[in-house]
Amino acid sequence: MLFYSFFKSLVGKDVVVELKNDLSICGTLHSVDQYLNIKLTDISVTDPEKYPHMLSVKNCFIRGSVVRYVQLPADEVDTQLLQDAARKEALQQKQ
């Protein structure tokens, strides 16, 4: 649940989601659920010539299992806090 909580804290921020089919979608994070499914608003694709059918899409739902990467705004992410939380959760799972 660590990453779910982390992504919930980024709702309203601009992110780039790269899918396993190499499609990259930029947009505002609207919501995320426990399966890390993502809803984006005000989207645009990074390569509109390759994906012209996506030009008319403004909002989308992305299934968590098709996500390769999520690029986050650097100023919104406290990496030290995230590392500490990941270590704490890993220790709790071992016990």
Swiss-Prot record:
Entry keyword Ribonucleoprotein: yes
Alphabetized GO MF terms: RNA binding; small GTPase binding; U6 snRNA binding
Modification sites for Phosphothreonine: 79
Residue ranges occupied by any Sm domain in the UniProt entry: 2-76
Keywords: mRNA processing, mRNA splicing, Nucleus, Phosphoprotein, Ribonucleoprotein, RNA-binding, Spliceosome
Record-stated family: Belongs to the snRNP Sm proteins family.
Subunit: Component of the precatalytic spliceosome (spliceosome B complex). Component of the U4/U6-U5 tri-snRNP complex, a building block of the precatalytic spliceosome (spliceosome B complex). The U4/U6-U5 tri-snRNP complex is composed of the U4, U6 and U5 snRNAs and at least PRPF3, PRPF4, PRPF6, PRPF8, PRPF31, SNRNP200, TXNL4A, SNRNP40, SNRPB, SNRPD1, SNRPD2, SNRPD3, SNRPE, SNRPF, SNRPG, DDX23, CD2BP2, PPIH, SNU13, EFTUD2, SART1 and USP39, plus LSM2, LSM3, LSM4, LSM5, LSM6, LSM7 and LSM8.
Official protein name in the record: U6 snRNA-associated Sm-like protein LSm2
Origin species: Homo sapiens (Human)
High-level lineage: Eukaryota, Metazoa, Chordata, Craniata, Vertebrata
